UniProtKB/Swiss-Prot annotation:
Residues 1-39 are annotated as: Disordered. Its EC number is 2.1.1.77. Belongs to the methyltransferase superfamily. L-isoaspartyl/D-aspartyl protein methyltransferase family. This is Protein-L-isoaspartate O-methyltransferase.
Amino acid sequence: MINPFSSFRWRHSSRSPAGIPEVEPQPPDASDPFASQREQMVKKQLIKRGIRDPRVLEAMGKVPRHLFVPSDLRDRAYRDCPLPIGYGQTISQPYIVAFMTEAARLTPESVVLEIGTGSGYQAAVLAELARQVYSLERLSPLAAQAQQTLAALGYRNVEVRQGDGYQGWPEHAPYDAILVTAAPPTVPMVLLDQLAVGGTLVVPVGESPSDSGAQGSQSLLILCKTAQGWVQKGAFPVQFVPMV
């Protein structure tokens, strides 16, 4: 089993034929004041709550979550809670990011579609595990900021585009996995159509909280596509911003 707390420096090389991040063992980076917080996040929020995939744990322990949140919230970046990122949107709590990523069952050759780029954090985690990530964001300012952050961190296997998540990204379909980070009222069949047979769709579905204070009701669905249709593998109560 990979030790998720080993010190590595990730190098994203455009010369790698598969676009897979290369790992170089390095001494602990004393210049990173958040390294110990990431380690504690993985130990206390993820492993203790059942996240087991060593590749997911390693990715969560490497991606600098504090660089995907507003600067005045960086001291809260590794807490077990969502945080606002502007425009009425949030970055999901670390456990939800890890849970959805693990549910997607990614391999180093996977091609992934993300609906709802937001800050770009989920896309970065996916990029550590997959060959290529395509991410759609409805809000142009968030799409631009996420692309800038991802590029600055060296991610060459992520492409971000402003667009309507309900339409997906048919040019690159079929996808091995599709993750949706906002809640539609029902499962978008267009996204299932863009999923490869054997692929997984992870999507929160249901009503979002209303301005009047009603809580709403949502479930995180894990749907696996088969040659005959699709099979639901799980449903868990969650609370996401609405998909619009």
